[in-house]
Amino acid sequence: MASTSARSGDKKDTWPIQAAASLGGGQKASLSRSEEFLTRISTELTDEALFTARSHMNPMPDKEKQTKDQGTQISRHVFFTKTRGTDTR
């Protein structure tokens, strides 16, 4: 009976190694891509949270915010206008 429990203990110890070996190259690569994706998303969320925290600590006056927003809208408008103007059908 002691040998049976020792065998099942051995199986538990080697199972993760066997499972990892049976995954193969393709699945390991997809796990790496998933981990890379999650790392990138985590970094972006952290950066966004830090930016939000900084903006709450140093709030910008409303007039300055409005000027920045208008500048962004103008830039976007000019960008789309230039794109449409280059159509040479």
UniProtKB/Swiss-Prot annotation:
Tissue expression summary: Specifically expressed in testis (at protein level).
Region (Disordered): 1-31, 54-89
Protein name: Putative protein T-ENOL
Native organism: Rattus norvegicus (Rat)
